[in-house]
Amino acid sequence: MQINKLQVEAIKSGSVIDHIPAHIGFKLLSLFRFTETEKRITIGLNLPSQKLDKKDIIKIENTFLSDDQINQLAIYAPCATVNYIEKYNLVGKIFPSLPKKIDRILICPNSNCASHNHFITSSFIFTKDINNEINLKCQYCEKEFAKNIVL
């Protein structure tokens, strides 16, 4: 007999970010500044997953992610899902998609880039190379970088 038990406590209302690759959960907490809120946040790390082997999960009470946040999530956790919960019931499920452009979040690795000026915010567009790998191209210096270099 298999017993199904939640490994991270259920929330009454809010967002659940599920299927985050293991070790990425803390990065998302700081990226979206979830730790700067008074909202209750529950995080599970290195949980067993049929889909990923191991996963992280984040539950944020009384908070619903913006479309921009959901799409930025795809950069770090392309297989993630965002579940909206109301009265302990699932009312919506979203599968993030990679945005065309991302502003202010990332830092250009090129030390000579104009985006390092205090009056300019960084801006990247996403491209794919011949191997279908995701790259980021800085809008200011126009240099292209592998995803793992910028993230």
UniProtKB/Swiss-Prot annotation:
Q: Which Pfam families match?
A: PyrI (PF01948), PyrI_C (PF02748)
Q: Keywords on this record? A: Metal-binding, Pyrimidine biosynthesis, Zinc
A Gene Ontology molecular function term of the record = metal ion binding
Q: Which InterPro entries does UniProt cross-reference here?
A: Asp_carbamoyltransf_reg_N, Asp_carbamoylTrfase_reg, Asp_carbamoyltrfase_reg_C, Asp_carbatrfase_reg_C_sf, Asp_carbatrfase_reg_N_sf
Q: Which domain of life is it from?
A: Bacteria
Entry cofactors: Zn(2+)
Binding site residues for Zn(2+):
108, 113, 138, 141
**GO process terms (BP):** 'de novo' pyrimidine nucleobase biosynthetic process; pyrimidine nucleotide biosynthetic process
Manner of cofactor binding, per the entry note: Binds 1 zinc ion per subunit.
Keyword Kinase in record: no
Q: Mind telling me which NCBIfam families this protein's record contains?
A: ATCase_reg (TIGR00240)
Known partners and oligomeric status: Contains catalytic and regulatory chains.
Q: Which family does the record assign?
A: Belongs to the PyrI family.
Protein name in UniProt: Aspartate carbamoyltransferase regulatory chain
Species the sequence originates in: Buchnera aphidicola subsp. Schizaphis graminum (strain Sg)
Q: What is the lineage of its organism?
A: Bacteria, Pseudomonadati, Pseudomonadota, Gammaproteobacteria, Enterobacterales
